[in-house]
């Protein structure tokens, strides 16, 4: 079932001509107008033939949920075959439409446009954030293959109960302001906050499908950072030397920050027994699709987070209350999630990714809340130092109603800290293992959002994994657990930096990466061969990643290529520089698109400037030949 829901000022139709599959209708149904209504455009698909009753039930649930959100008691059901290219038989379609009509009629004023007729229609969409929503509904236990329903012919995809619950969980969306107001979205003016508007639309629509490649895909290839690997599964990438360098620097940085925060680095397996009693329960509480493989007649799954290994390790440890909060971190290279193929694109959404995963065992909820606050601030600092600032992302806070009532000040302070409105999702009932979580979400050039940093308060897994600590009285107690990824997936950080640069380019700014992450920090461009020796001397005075463009190209082309590679500092060496010992430097961060900023300084002054910019950050050597003439092309 494909469903398009439009909250409308009015919807009206008039039948014109019947098709060979048209249902017989009374004269009164040949035209209709319904005002202040939720219009449900629907296409019943071949996959729905396997279980029409389930399709009816799920569709009714979705329509009722949206009708409640937009506060209407009028519904127009409108068959609309153009929503799908894989339609069910007319007989099944009519059965489903009538079933939905019957199920809704007890609570709503329902009108149904006739099936199989050509119709003229007019509709006026209200235009608020909830006024246009789409849903894709499928009965369980079916597979789509070559446009047909194939029952039991393909290996069943492993989908957790939590992922199923995520599709049906009833939640309330609100905007929380820095002064503590919790506002309904329809009653909050999002106009001054265009990125928040895009994020709200993205979250509520739940549409993750890729319509076109975002700008970072072209950039990751042109900058020779990463690329698709056709020899692997979709969503598994190859990283060229420059991309691997950036990944390694980000990994090292996040690990350093976590270690300074008090976390112990560990390493755990990437696969686990799907039938392990404890792990099986957790699988059903985590909203993710898994890769599964068979090994020695056991069904295994590839981890989608470090939780499994760290919690099993916690179970075997002897922990005192004096050790709390106890923190462990792992840089998972890799974690695996069987994301749907149509959602995969570039570095935004992958099936194999690198995730810094930190868990904290806390003495009780009070200590967990205290740690949550500190880790919220930690995540802000981590992204800031990566080059992703508060203005660059939108905050989502998700919690149960009970937790909110008991911890309003904590939640309001989160909005106050970032000093801007945030999106809130609240559940009446807890469907998942957490009672509170937040994410920092980057909204890209195509208005698609991706979660970066996150922290969650987990109230289930200490019990599930039998994790305990010895309290001050010598008795065993269960800790409260925090899950934290200080940066989010490393690949997503690169994606966000590239997308941010692309958007800044559209605004007339000069794109670049932070200096500490730039593969080449200084490029020396000798004007001719006779200047190469002095270029070598200058390079020896710079404690950074420096290369020399010694190719037989014009000076103009060398400088342009350095610009296309986003090199932060470009040094041109000619006769003047050899004579007076200074260097001509173009500073990218201070340049405009048609007005480069150039200064004449000494190599020592340039070195001091760069050392100041990269102070406190990890460092790695240049991953390629120092001389551009010795480098291969990867793309």
UniProtKB/Swiss-Prot annotation:
Q: Where found in the cell?
A: Cytoplasm
From the UniProt entry, list the residue stretches annotated as the region Editing domain.
Answer: 1-144
Pfam families, per this entry?
HGTP_anticodon (PF03129), tRNA-synt_2b (PF00587), tRNA-Thr_ED (PF08915)
What role does it play?
Answer: Catalyzes the attachment of threonine to tRNA(Thr) in a two-step reaction: L-threonine is first activated by ATP to form Thr-AMP and then transferred to the acceptor end of tRNA(Thr). Also edits incorrectly charged L-seryl-tRNA(Thr).
Quote the catalytic activity from the record: tRNA(Thr) + L-threonine + ATP = L-threonyl-tRNA(Thr) + AMP + diphosphate + H(+)
What are the GO cellular component annotations?
Answer: cytoplasm
The cofactor(s) it depends on are:
Zn(2+)
Domain comment quoted from the record:
The N-terminal domain is an archaea-specific tRNA-editing domain that hydrolyzes incorrectly charged L-seryl-tRNA(Thr). Catalysis of tRNA editing is performed by the charged tRNA itself.
The UniProt record lists the keyword Zinc: yes
Q: Which SUPFAM superfamilies match?
A: Class II aaRS ABD-related, Class II aaRS and biotin synthetases
Q: How does it assemble?
A: Homodimer.
The record's annotation in CDD domains points to:
ThrRS_anticodon
Enumerate the UniProt keywords alphabetically.
Aminoacyl-tRNA synthetase, ATP-binding, Cytoplasm, Ligase, Metal-binding, Nucleotide-binding, Protein biosynthesis, RNA-binding, tRNA-binding, Zinc
Q: What GO molecular functions are on record for this protein?
A: ATP binding; threonine-tRNA ligase activity; tRNA binding; zinc ion binding
Please share the entry's free-text remark on the cofactor: Binds 1 zinc ion per subunit.
> What's the main place this protein lives?
cytoplasm
Q: What is this protein's record name?
A: Threonine--tRNA ligase
Q: What class of enzyme is it?
A: ligase
Give its E.C. classification number.
6.1.1.3
Which residues of this UniProt protein bind Zn(2+)?
307, 359, 483
């Amino acid at each position: 079932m494909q469903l398009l829901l439009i909250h409308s000022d009015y919807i009206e139709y008039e039948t014109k001509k019947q098709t060979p599959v048209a249902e017989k209708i009374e004269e009164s149904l040949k035209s209709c107008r319904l005002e202040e209504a939720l219009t449900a455009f629907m296409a019943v698909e071949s996959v729905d033939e396997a279980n029409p009753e389930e399709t009816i039930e799920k569709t009714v649930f979705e329509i009722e949920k949206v009708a409640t959100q937009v506060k209407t008691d009028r519904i127009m059901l409108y068959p609309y075959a153009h929503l799908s290219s894989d339609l069910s038989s007319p007989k099944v379609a009519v059965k489903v439409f009538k079933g939905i009509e019957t199920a809704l009629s007890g609570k709503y004023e329902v009108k149904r446009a006739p099936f199989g007729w050509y119709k003229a229609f007019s509709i006026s969409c209200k235009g608020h954030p909830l006024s246009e929503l789409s849903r894709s509904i499928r009965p369980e236990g079916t597979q789509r293959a070559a446009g047909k329903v194939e029952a039991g012919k393909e290996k069943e995809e492993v989908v957790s109960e939590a992922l199923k619950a995520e599709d049906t969980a009833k939640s309330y969306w609100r905007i929380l302001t820095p002064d503590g107001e919790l506002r309904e979205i329809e009653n909050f003016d999002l106009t001054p906050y265009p990125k928040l508007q895009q994020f709200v639309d993205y979250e509520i629509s739940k549409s993750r499908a890729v319509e076109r490649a975002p700008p970072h895909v072209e950039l990751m290839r042109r900058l020779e950072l990463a690329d698709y690997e056709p020899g692997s599964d979709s969503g598994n990438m190859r990283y060229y030397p420059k991309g691997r360098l950036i990944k390694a620097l980000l990994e090292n940085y996040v690990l350093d920050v976590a270690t300074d925060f008090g976390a112990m680095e560990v390493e755990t397996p990437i696969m686990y027994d799907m039938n392990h009693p404890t792990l099986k329960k957790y699988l059903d509480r985590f909203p993710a699709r898994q890769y599964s493989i068979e090994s020695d007649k056991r069904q295994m799954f590839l981890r989608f987070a470090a939780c499994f290994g760290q919690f099993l390790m916690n179970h075997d440890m002897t922990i005192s209350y004096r050790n709390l909060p106890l923190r462990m971190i792992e840089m998972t290279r890799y974690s695996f999630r069987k994301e749907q193929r149509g959602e995969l694109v570039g570095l935004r959404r992958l099936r194999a990714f690198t995730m810094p995963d930190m868990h904290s065992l806390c003495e009780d909820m009070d200590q967990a809340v205290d740690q949550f606050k500190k880790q919220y601030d930690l995540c802000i600092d981590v992204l800031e130092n990566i080059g992703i600032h508060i203005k660059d992302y939108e905050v989502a806070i998700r919690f149960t109603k009970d937790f909110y009532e008991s911890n309003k000040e904590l939640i309001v302070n989160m909005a106050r800290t970032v000093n801007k409105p945030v999106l809130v999702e609240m559940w009446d009932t807890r469907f998942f293992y957490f009672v509170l979580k937040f994410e920092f979400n980057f909204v890209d050039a195509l208005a698609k959002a991706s979660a970066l940093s996150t922290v969650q308060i987990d109230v289930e897994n200490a019990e599930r994994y039998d994790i305990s600590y010895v309290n001050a009285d010598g008795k065993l107690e269960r800790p409260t657990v925090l899950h934290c990824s200080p940066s989010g997936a490393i690949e997503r950080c690169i994606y966000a930096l590239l997308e941010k640069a692309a958007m800044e380019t559209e605004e007339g700014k000069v794109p670049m990466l932070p200096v500490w992450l730039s593969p080449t920090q200084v490029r020396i461009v000798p004007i001719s061969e006779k200047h190469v020796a002095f270029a070598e001397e200058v390079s020896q005075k710079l404690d950074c990643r420096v290369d020399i463009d010694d190719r037989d190209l014009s000076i103009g082309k060398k400088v342009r290529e350095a610009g296309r590679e986003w090199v932060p500092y470009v040094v041109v060496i000619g006769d003047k520089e050899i004579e007076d010992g200074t260097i001509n430097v173009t500073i990218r961060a201070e340049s405009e698109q048609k007005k480069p900023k150039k200064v004449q300084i000494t190599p020592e002054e340039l070195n001091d400037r760069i050392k100041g910019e990269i102070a406190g950050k990890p460092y790695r050597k240049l991953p390629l030949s120092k001389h551009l003439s010795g480098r291969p092309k990867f793309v």
